């Protein structure tokens, strides 16, 4: 596959929580120019804001009123950016399929990182749009084993590329001082890094917060009422923290947690934070998420309910050093650099 540029359509903001899209695309941008197209953003006037963020060009459609995702103006701006180059269309959401109109005949990659139709407030037409995208994509990359299993019936176009880790970045947690936000908190400190939304088990958090520990949730609260979250004095919500500061946060954790609910929104998740936690040499406790059990069940403590989760957190100090070391080595084996290289080789064979 010969391409001169990549056009990306994403439901996530490029300057949001640093995760799979940013990790992959900043690396792909070292090979060819990348345009990252976001969903519309309400503003006082209609225009397409185009700016460089690192080595990626970000197009944010600003609209004075509600507009369709990837509307005609966005498609026109994308077409102008492409110019006469050979483009690859790379989508994270089926709702952006119209971006393909900016480059008729261009190959399409669907990097499927979540079962978006199962999320709260998903557009009712999303499933139909995904059917169209699955039919048109030359390659379907799945960010986890469960997503792969649900789509492998489509044949050789479907590839498993579970999320990786920037190992050296997170391994710094072993050698640096804890973040100032954590230095005065009583131990043990159990921490979560990521979006706080409908995937979090609020009742489980309440059970955990009743124990003698500090609970720290690092990330934006979205799609849920913050008032429904535990409001105890030992529970702390920091909001989003810069990616550069995450190792210092992990340096202050006694245990890292994944307190996910068991619901439709979590049935197919493969949390990027798993190898990030492990690379930091922190004991990890998770609820019974299928992909975590399948890929990391031997190095992550898996809890079946709220009480066993809280018990595992409080017992984390007794985690055998061999288990922590094995988790570190597991994380070392799944670098983003290696994943991007394998993706590129796969596309060259298409």
What are these model-derived regions, one by one?
Residues 15-19, 200, 244-249, 256-279, ...:
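Nucleotide-sugar-dependent
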Residues 146, 161-173:
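Carbohydrate-associated surface elements
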Residues 298-307, 314-320:
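Conserved acidic donor-binding segment of nucleotide-sugar-dependent glycosyltransferases
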